[in-house]
Swiss-Prot record:
The lineage of its organism: Viruses, Duplodnaviria, Heunggongvirae, Peploviricota, Herviviricetes. The gene is UL108. This is Uncharacterized protein UL108. It comes from Human cytomegalovirus (strain AD169).
Length: 123
C-alpha cells in the first residue's frame, strides 16, 4: 500500500529578536522567500532559523554552500499535501531538476495546525 512519509514536525514560534548566530546565518544566506498559500508574516525569519538549525539537512546545506556559489536561493513553503503530491516519487531529500535546479527538503513545519513542507531551492 501507499505509505505516507513520516513527518518531523516543529512548532513555529514568532520571536521578535534574532539571536546573533541566526543573524549571521541570515546575512550569509541572503535568502529571499516565496511563501505559497500562507501569509508571509506567519513565518518569521527567527522562527524559520529555529527550524533550519534544528534540521539535519542543515549540515548538507552548509556543505553545499561552502563549495559553490548560487545566483539565487529561495525558500519554498508548500502545503504538505501539495509537497507530497509533487515529490512523492522522489525518495531522496536532495534532488536536481532537468534545468539544473537543486532542491533540498528541510523539514515539515506546523502553522496553525496545518502542516507545510519547507524546501530550499538553489540555482
Amino acid at each position: 500500500g501507499h505509505r505516507r512519509p513520516r513527518r518531523r514536525v516543529y512548532s513555529v514560534r514568532c520571536d521578535h529578536c534574532v539571536e546573533p548566530e541566526k543573524a549571521r546565518l541570515a546575512r550569509r544566506l541572503r535568502i529571499g522567500s516565496r511563501v505559497c498559500g500562507i501569509p508571509k508574516n506567519i513565518i518569521s525569519w527567527s522562527s524559520f532559523f529555529d527550524v533550519l538549525l534544528s534540521s539535519r539537512s542543515c549540515f548538507v546545506f552548509f556543505f553545499l554552500f561552502s563549495r559553490w556559489n548560487f545566483s539565487s536561493v529561495r525558500v519554498l513553503v508548500m502545503e504538505a499535501c501539495v509537497f507530497e503530491h509533487e515529490f512523492e516519487k522522489i525518495k531522496r531529500p536532495i534532488f536536481v531538476s532537468k534545468k539544473g535546479q537543486i532542491s533540498i527538503f528541510l523539514t515539515y513545519i506546523m502553522v496553525n495546525s496545518e502542516s507545510y513542507g519547507v524546501l530550499l531551492s538553489l540555482k
